[in-house]
Regions:
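Residue-level recognition of single "structural anchor" positions
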Residues: 1-292
Length: 292
């Protein structure tokens, strides 16, 4: 069986991180679809493990959180009639938390947009940030209980609630109604109204759509398995935090946040995959959990 060199792995991973679909990569590199897909899975696992172990004790004054929509296998309205729809088909949400100063993605979670995932996401965020900070979310009610459970009174939390105009119905329209204004809802602590914003996390949503082909609207490159969707997100977050230089900061977010003291290359992510392969596999019962 042929094995990809680290150079070939790095090339394929870079193409994935720059928004290219799996089939397009096979046409460019000559690697099989299964080879590219397996590398995505292996890289996603390695990147998720590295993030979990190393993005800890982050010093942050302000964090913004949001959820970005995509779908797996079929859109939610079509899942009931879709042929052989797998578990996890339909709406797929990615929860993200960004540090407003360093632009580091501190925490992320792939799953549903409900109270259970809100609790898991906010608890993970609490485990990664050191000290008290100001948190801003959108108006999703699930955040209120999740923040109370994770932080109690040790946080300054506000929600930026958007006010929308009337819904415009037109053939092929998929965007939401026009936002006509916002209002601040102070939930816990003493949040500074001047910094109640979700602008940075919403801008990072655009970066995700530009750098992951499966997030691009109106294409056939959407995820077919929710597990692979989560692996793609993990790879992107590693690339965004450690490899891609932020234009404004002139360093990577991980460097700006003090998580690392050097600029990573895409080859470093390929090395993470190689190191993970060298470790003996752990034996034990399979337990399906929430994808991080």
């Amino acid at each position: 069986m042929n094995r990809l060199s680290n150079e070939d792995r790095a090339k394929i991973l870079h193409l994935l991180c720059e928004g290219m679909s799996i089939r397009a990569i096979t046409r460019l590199t000559g690697a099989s679809k299964n080879t590219v897909a397996k590398l995505l899975v292996d890289a996603g696992k390695a990147c998720a493990a590295y993030h979990d172990a190393n993005v800890r004790e982050v010093k942050s004054a302000r964090v913004q959180v949001d959820e970005i929509w995509s779908f797996t296998y079929a859109k939610q309205k079509n899942v009931a009639t879709a042929k052989d729809a797998p578990e996890g088909a339909g709406d797929t949400w990615t929860w993200t938390a960004i540090d407003a100063d360093s632009k580091l993605i501190v925490s992320y979670l792939v799953g549903s947009r409900d109270a259970e995932y809100a609790v898991a996401f906010i608890q993970d965020l609490a485990d990664r940030v050191a000290g008290r900070f100001q948190l801003t979310s959108d108006g999703l009610n699930a955040y209120i209980g999740a923040v109370e459970d994770a932080f109690g009174d040790d946080i300054d939390f506000a929600q930026l609630v958007k006010i929308y105009g009337p819904t415009v119905t037109a053939p092929g329209r998929y965007s939401p109604a026009e936002c006509t204004g916002t209002r601040i809802r102070r939930v816990r602590g003493d949040p500074d109204g001047a910094h109640v914003s979700t602008s940075y996390v919403e801008r990072s949503n655009l970066t995700m759509r530009m750098h992951m082909r499966r997030f691009t609207r109106l294409t056939k490159a959407f995820s077919k398995k929710v597990e692979n969707h989560a692996h793609a997100v993990a790879l992107h977050m590693m690339f965004y935090n450690f490899v891609r230089i932020h234009k404004t900061l002139r360093v990577t977010p991980a460097m700006a946040a003090g998580v690392t003291d050097r600029l990573w290359e895409i080859e470093d992510i390929a090395k993470l995959v190689e190191e993970a392969e060298a470790k003996p596999a752990k034996r034990g019962p399979y337990r399906k959990g929430i994808s991080n």
